[in-house]
């Protein structure tokens, strides 16, 4: 069937990146990756829009585009909530329905939605609190050893 063909293709593609860890560094690394962010977006569109909206604005589930979060304090918490669920199963666990890499990639996509809707729009959930910025993805290149200025002085 088509679904099996898509699943087989995804497994072949995942062989390129191996098993992804649902940690801060990995999630931030894949936020801006053109190929893999599309996989995260596809997972989101297939499984998340009915509760969180097409743009993450929130419907039944919370707004994912603002700085107010209830079950997430750091970026890796997104993968944990996707995997384990939250709010007494209002947010279901996806760990038995998604490949572990899909969980990491959808977490990266959800993290990328932050700040994409104008302030004051989207659904507000009682108990949400402001959280710090996710931070920057890890550097992909090492600075030359003879670079002007040292990292310690910054």
Outline where the language-model segments fall.
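Flexible coil segments in periplasmic/lumen-exposed cytochrome c-class electron-transfer proteins
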Residues: 92-154
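Electrostatic cytochrome c docking/interface patches
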Residues: 10-43, 139-154
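Sec-exported extracytoplasmic/periplasmic mature domains
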Residues: 45, 49, 53, 83-87, ...
């Amino acid at each position: 069937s088509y679904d099996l063909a898509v699943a087989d293709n995804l497994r072949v593609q995942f062989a390129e990146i191996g098993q992804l860890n649902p940690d801060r560094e990995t999630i931030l690394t894949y936020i801006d990756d053109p190929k893999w962010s599309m996989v995260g977006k596809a997972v989101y569109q297939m499984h998340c829009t009915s509760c969180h909206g097409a743009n993450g604005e929130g419907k039944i589930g919370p707004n994912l585009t603002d700085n107010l979060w209830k079950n997430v304090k750091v970026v890796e918490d997104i993968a944990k909530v996707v995997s384990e669920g939250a709010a007494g199963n209002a947010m279901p666990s996806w760990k038995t329905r998604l490949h572990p890499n899909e969980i990491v990639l959808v977490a990266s996509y959800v993290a990328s939605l932050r700040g994409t809707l104008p302030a004051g729009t989207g659904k507000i959930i009682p108990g949400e609190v402001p959280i710090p910025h996710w931070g920057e993805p890890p550097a992909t290149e090492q600075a030359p050893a003879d670079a002007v200025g040292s990292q310690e002085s910054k």
